[in-house]
Regions:
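Perimembrane helix-loop-helix junctions
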Residues: 7, 171-174, 202-228
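Short periplasmic/luminal acceptor-recognition loop of GT-C membrane glycosyltransferases, typified by
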Residues: 76, 380-383, 391-449, 453-477, ...
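Transmembrane-helix motifs of polytopic, lipid-linked glycan transferases
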Residues: 106-126, 163, 295
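Transmembrane-helix signature of polytopic, membrane-embedded enzymes
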Residues: 116-140, 159, 305-311
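Membrane-interface alpha helices of multi-pass inner-membrane proteins
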Residues: 135, 162, 179-197, 202-209, ...
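Hydrophobic, aromatic-rich transmembrane alpha-helices
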Residues: 277-310, 314-317
Length: 519
């Protein structure tokens, strides 16, 4: 029944609003659980992750101790992510490094859950079905989960992008929007640039979309907002070390090569979310998945609300195909545009089916397909457990602890202790090989980079204890370097993980440490 003004009763409106947010909360909860459980089953909250996540957290901790990236240590990305992690690193000074890192990881999982809810919100004007499928698709989409499970660059960059889309949405239907909202949207795009330089690709696509819908003044305001925020965050670091910052963020990234998935097919496979499949399959499956995504793009294009996501999916996807390096989390760059496009396409497909019974059948079939895809998470794990007994050796180390993976310093709660003791700090040991190769103008692998081999040995040997987990068996350290490391007393071993006591040839072992293991 309507009131005299033609509006539904207040209690009906309240119930609708409650149901409205219930869907968002449910989608976010599913997304959070999907991100948390594989980590708990795998390495656990204190485990070893992707290497990169430890690099960014270690960099944030160094900033909390007064060090500056580019000037005091190498960082191959803009400073946005370490700055975002600095509050967790500061809080860790009152607890422990591992606790701060765990809190940061959980925060990223929560951001992933928020991202899923934002996708639902963005697609809501298209229809409830599109919003539901879009949000749930992101919740279980392998590239999204992989990137949101820890402190990787793609997670906060996705959040910034989705809020940008939401803020600019009124422009689609010639609606009015305040200048400050447009400026904030631009600033958020600028934030993506300060997190990863790939944000420039996102900015260009957003500007092209605004020009296509003839929002010229909005495009200018977005450009100004993005430039302003990027300048505020990056210029202080650039002023201190301009050459080093340029070389590390731009030159080294353009010059570097490496990672798996070097073929177009491998990359398309990851972008389409087929990484969830734990067994081999014919290339025809990948081709079919890509064709399905292009079909979704064609369907979604009929909605003006979905055109920016479609452009982002195609533009960012094309960029991923040509970038010189590739790692699994790179597919997270397109995760949100892909699921937004899929959600809008499903909404359009169901709308094309006129008969209500047929719509129900199509919805059930698509829901079943999504459920089958999500079932792939039943046995997936992320990360590796770190041997707790290694802390016996690091806790009693009289000097510094060195490592080939900064995550081990976090796991043993020696990162902040090292920094307080004035130990030599290296957030990204492997990244130095890219910097050295680019500076020399040589395309040389890490194993054959003699300058890096000397650099790594010099650093690892500067500690009283060294934890080696990343480059065993010739994967990063060549035979000569490995032979030197093997001469150091072995304190503990767990699988390929080792704790060694660096000593020079002919020098005695450092007293006060637990007795080395017999080999």
């Amino acid at each position: 029944m309507l009131d005299p003004m033609g509006n539904p009763p207040a209690h009906t409106q309240d119930r609708t609003l409650s149901l409205h947010w219930l869907w968002a909360i449910a989608i976010a909860a599913i997304a959070f659980v999907i991100r948390l459980v594989p980590v708990l089953r795998g390495g656990g909250p204190f485990g070893i992750g992707n290497y990169d996540d430890g690099v960014y957290y270690a960099a944030g901790t160094a900033i909390a101790h007064g060090l500056l990236p580019y000037q005091d240590f190498l960082l191959l990305h803009p400073p946005g992510m370490p700055l975002l992690l600095t509050p967790f690193a500061l809080a860790a000074q009152f607890t422990s490094d591992s606790s701060g890192f765990t809190a940061a990881r959980v925060a990223c999982m929560l951001l992933g859950a928020i991202n899923a809810a934002l996708i639902w919100k963005i697609l809501k004007p298209i229809g409830a079905t599109a919003a539901l499928f879009g949000g749930l698709s992101y919740a279980v989409f392998y590239p999204a989960v992989y990137s949101d499970k820890s402190t990787l660059l793609e997670c906060p960059a996705t959040t910034a992008l989705l809020i940008t889309i939401l803020l600019l949405q009124p422009l689609i239907n010639s609606g009015s929007i305040s200048r400050w909202k447009i400026f904030v949207a631009g600033a958020l795009v600028g934030l993506t640039i300060t997190i990863k330089i790939w944000g420039f690709v996102t900015l260009m696509i957003v500007l092209v979309w605004l020009l296509l819908i003839r929002r010229f003044s909005a495009a200018l305001q977005v450009l100004i907002g993005s430039a302003a925020l990027a300048a505020v965050i990056c210029l202080p670091f650039f002023a201190v070390a301009p050459t080093a910052m340029w070389n590390q963020i731009v030159r080294d990234q353009l010059f570097r090569r490496g990672g798996g998935g070097r073929t177009f097919l491998d990359r398309l496979d990851a972008i389409a979310g087929l990484g969830i499949v734990g067994r081999s399959y014919p290339a025809a499956i990948t081709v079919a998945a890509v064709v399905a995504l292009l079909f979704c793009a064609a369907l979604a294009w009929s909605y003006r609300e979905a055109r920016l996501p479609v452009l982002l999916m195609l533009g960012q996807g094309a960029f991923l195909l040509i970038t010189p390096t590739w790692f699994p989390h790179f597919a997270g760059f397109t995760a949100a545009p892909v699921t937004l496009t899929v959600g809008a396409a499903i909404g359009r497909l169901i709308a094309l089916v006129r008969a209500r019974p047929a719509q129900i059948v199509v919805s059930l079939v698509l829901a079943g397909a999504l459920l089958v895809y999500a079932s792939g998470w039943s046995d997936i794990t992320f990360g590796r457990r770190f041997p707790s007994r290694f802390q016996t050796f690091t806790a009693t180390a009289p000097g510094c602890v060195t490592t080939d993976d900064a995550t081990t310093l976090v796991a043993t709660d020696t990162l902040s202790r090292n920094l307080s003791r004035g130990c030599r700090f290296i957030a990204d040991l492997g990244g130095n090989s890219h910097d050295m190769a680019a500076a020399a103008g040589l395309e040389v692998s890490r194993n054959h980079n003699q300058q890096f081999q000397r650099f790594a040995l010099d650093y690892l040997g500067s500690g009283s204890v060294s934890i080696l987990i990343r480059y065993p068996g010739g994967r990063g350290f060549n035979a000569k370097t490995t032979a030197v490391l093997d001469q150091w007393p072995l304190l503990a071993r767990s699988g390929s993980y080792q704790v060694r006591q660096p000593v020079g040839l002919g020098q005695p072992a450092i007293p006060g440490l637990p007795k080395p293991q017999r080999r």
